[in-house]
C-alpha cells in the first residue's frame, strides 16, 4: 500500500503544469502574423498619406490588443478560438476600410485634376462618398472574412466605376451658346449692305470675341464664372 501510495504521489507530482497555454500561445502567434500581413497591405495603399496609413495601423494594433486580451482571458479552447477569430475579423475589416479609403483618394484625385467646375466636382465627390459609405457599412456588418473580402471588392469596383467626364457639361453648354451667338452675328453681317472688307473686319471681331469667351470658359472654375464668361 505504501509503495502504491508513494508511486501515485510521485506520478502526480511529476506532472508538469506549463506556465503558458499552448492553445493561447498559438492563437497569439497567428494573430501577430495577421497583424504583420495587415500592415503590409496598408503600405500598398499608395493613395493614402503617411498619416492615414499610420491611423489604419494604429487601429489594427488596437483591435489586436483587444483580441489578445480576450485570448488570455479565455477559459476554454472554444473561447480561445472565438477570441482569435473575432480579432482576425476585426483586423480584416481595418484593412478593407483602408482599401476603400485608398480607392476614394484615387478617384477624388482624378476628379480634382479634371476640367470640371467646382460644382460638378462636388457632385462627383459626393457620389464617391456615398459609395464609400455603403461599402464600409457592408464591410463592418460582415460576419466572415469572405464577406469582408466580397464587400471590399464590390466597394472598390463601384468607386472606380464612377465616371469622370473629360469635358464639363456646363462649359460645353456655354461654348455652344457663344458659338450660336457668333453664328447669328455673322449671319447678320452677311445680310448687311457693308462691303466685303467691312464684313471681314467685323467677322474677325466676332471670332476674336468668341475665342476670348471660349478661353475664359475653359479657365472658369465655377458655374457662375462659366456663366459670366459666356
Spans of model-derived segments:
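Amphipathic alpha-helical assembly segments used for oligomerization, scaffolding, or translocation
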Residues: 1-230
Amino acid at each position: 500500500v505504501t509503495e502504491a501510495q508513494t508511486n501515485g504521489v510521485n506520478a502526480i507530482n511529476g506532472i508538469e503544469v506549463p506556465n503558458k497555454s499552448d492553445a493561447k500561445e498559438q492563437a497569439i502567434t497567428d494573430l501577430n502574423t495577421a497583424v504583420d500581413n495587415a500592415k503590409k497591405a496598408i503600405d500598398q495603399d499608395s493613395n493614402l498619406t503617411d498619416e492615414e496609413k499610420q491611423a489604419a495601423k494604429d487601429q489594427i494594433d488596437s483591435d489586436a490588443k483587444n483580441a489578445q486580451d480576450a485570448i488570455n482571458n479565455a477559459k476554454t479552447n472554444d473561447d480561445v478560438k472565438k477570441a482569435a477569430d473575432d480579432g482576425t475579423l476585426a483586423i480584416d475589416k481595418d484593412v478593407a476600410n483602408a482599401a476603400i479609403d485608398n480607392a476614394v483618394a484615387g478617384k477624388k484625385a482624378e476628379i480634382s485634376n479634371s476640367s470640371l467646375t467646382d460644382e460638378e466636382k462636388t457632385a462627383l465627390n459626393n457620389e464617391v462618398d456615398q459609395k464609400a459609405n455603403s461599402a464600409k457599412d457592408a464591410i463592418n456588418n460582415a460576419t466572415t472574412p469572405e464577406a469582408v473580402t466580397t464587400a471590399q471588392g464590390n466597394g472598390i469596383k463601384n468607386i472606380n466605376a464612377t465616371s469622370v467626364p473629360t469635358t464639363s457639361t456646363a462649359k460645353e453648354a456655354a461654348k455652344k451658346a457663344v458659338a450660336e451667338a457668333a453664328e447669328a452675328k455673322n449671319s447678320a453681317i452677311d445680310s448687311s449692305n457693308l462691303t466685303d472688307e467691312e464684313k471681314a473686319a467685323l467677322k474677325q471681331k466676332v471670332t476674336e470675341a468668341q475665342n476670348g469667351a471660349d478661353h475664359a470658359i475653359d479657365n472658369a472654375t465655377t458655374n457662375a464664372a462659366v456663366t459670366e464668361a459666356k
